[in-house]
């Protein structure tokens, strides 16, 4: 088959696809030229990550395109229902990046609990002259052990995050549409431990959590899941983490909550208006920042590439 990896693919995935006899293009084609490239080269499958948008006009313009695979989890850059209605198979790689995203969230959580995000900004500028003052300023850290983490969206990424948090001695609450109990397995050395985690609704969990992490897709109506009302129900001084999608958290409400102290700190990996996030978010001292890199590890990208190759093989066998 002829396959275009428009946002690139890990060498392991490229090797697997080419070894299976597929013709693979890996250059990035600009949006205005993408339909023509697909049609001129008889492309059967389009591989994308988050950069390439697959909207209705592109789908209409490429009637012979057979499948679209999103390397990653969220598919809000693809008009999935429309593509499927027009006979195109649409898949993603939901399991491949879970651990990498969870580790990034834990990195933000550690940074915020000890003000590392801000001290790393100020030490190069003020560290020599104001060392004692900075030491005093950042001397009110918190241990994660004993804190309660609510994980909103308790799928693969949420459960992977739960494993890390439980390993740090945190109490974990899962947030999903159906309440109940979920068993989380922890591998410690050669032993396995199973821990029961309560699962409840968002509004039940909000007042209980010391930290809240979001792992849900962008909403179909474009509205934020966490706005000023939800933040008002949280514990004062809560830590809020978003490595899901920009817009899931109302950015105006977040800034207000940070300024008032309702939210003590926020770890933000995703933004409205990417790749040009708003400047006041970038400069806020209460925010630990990263540029949408949840799945950006070599290990995750290798797994994504190999999972894509496996999906292509499955599609080709039908």
For the regions a protein language model found, what residue spans apply to each?
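Hydrophobic/small residue at the entry helix of a nucleotide-binding pocket
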Residues: 157
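Conserved N-terminal Rossmann-fold NAD(P)-binding element of oxidoreductases
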Residues: 6, 150-153
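An N-terminal-biased, well-structured beta-alpha scaffold segment characteristic
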Residues: 1-90, 207, 227
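Phosphate-coordination loops involved in phosphoryl transfer and adenosine-cofactor binding
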Residues: 65, 145-148, 228, 237
């Amino acid at each position: 088959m002829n396959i275009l990896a428009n946002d690139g693919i890990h060498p392991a995935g490229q090797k697997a696809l080419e070894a299976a006899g597929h013709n693979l293009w890996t250059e990035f084609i600009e949006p205005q030229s993408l339909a023509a490239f697909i049609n001129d080269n008889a492309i059967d499958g389009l591989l994308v990550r988050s950069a390439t948008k697959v909207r209705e006009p592109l789908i209409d313009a490429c009637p012979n395109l057979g499948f679209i695979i999103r390397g990653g989890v969220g598919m809000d850059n693809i008009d999935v229902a429309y593509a499927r209605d027009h006979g195109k198979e649409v898949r993603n790689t939901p399991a491949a990046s879970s651990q990498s995203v969870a580790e990034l969230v834990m990195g933000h959580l550690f940074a915020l609990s000890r003000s590392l995000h801000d001290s790393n900004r100020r030490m190069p500028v003020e560290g020599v002259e104001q060392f004692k003052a900075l030491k005093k300023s950042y001397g009110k850290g918190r241990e994660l052990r004993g804190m309660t983490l609510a994980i909103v969206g308790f799928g693969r990424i949420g459960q992977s995050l739960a494993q890390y948090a439980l390993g740090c001695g945190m109490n974990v609450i899962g947030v999903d549409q159906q309440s109940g109990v979920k068993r989380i397995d922890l591998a410690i050395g050669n032993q396995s431990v199973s821990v029961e985690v309560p699962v409840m609704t968002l509004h039940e969990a909000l007042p209980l959590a010391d930290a809240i992490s979001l792992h849900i897709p962008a909403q179909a109506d474009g509205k934020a899941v966490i706005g000023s009302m939800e933040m008002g129900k949280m514990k004062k001084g809560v830590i809020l983490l978003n490595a899901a999608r920009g817009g899931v958290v109302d950015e105006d409400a977040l800034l207000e909550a940070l300024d008032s102290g309702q939210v003590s700190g926020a770890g933000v990996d995703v933004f409205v208006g990417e790749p040009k996030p708003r400047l006041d978010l970038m400069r806020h001292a209460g925010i630990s920042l990263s540029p949408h890199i949840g799945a950006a590890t070599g290990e995750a990208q290798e797994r994504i590439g190999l999972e894509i190759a496996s999906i292509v093989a499955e599609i080709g066998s039908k």
